[in-house]
Amino acid sequence: MKTILQILPSLHKINGGVERGTLDIARELAERKYNSVIISSGGEMADRYKYKGVSHHKIEINKKGLVNFFASRGKFKKLLDQIKPDLVHVRSRWPSFCFTSEIKKRKIPYVTTYHGTYSGNQNLLKKSYNKVMTNGDKIISISKFIDDHIRHFFPEVKNKLV
């Protein structure tokens, strides 16, 4: 059975698009007999589909900072050893920033979803942080508007957009 791992900061926002999309995909994957796994810092939606075959692992990735960066990376490496995903889907900048190098080091196919027009692309440091969402083997843009935004600020990744 193939294992698909989705990663996002939290499952707190009941009406959040990232959260809702993650859970909808997780449920669909489980229904299609994939091993569907989510990593987040938890939240009221974390156990929503547990009974439908979706598993959730908690790592505190909703708080930015150097201490949390190293703590979450250590836990993530252990979970990767345990889960052995066939595909990783990262849905937010901070988890992408923290985990991309480990995903790529293990040569796990890697997808990101670019959910918004992250501000600050005029600032070199902020643009570098925003660019972590283009590190996937493929980049899912949630709309034509977001697709155009990515092409404008990161034209070198246009062939990775789906």
Predicted features and spans:
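An amphipathic, basic-hydrophobic alpha-helix
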Residues: 52, 62-88, 97-101, 105-106, ...
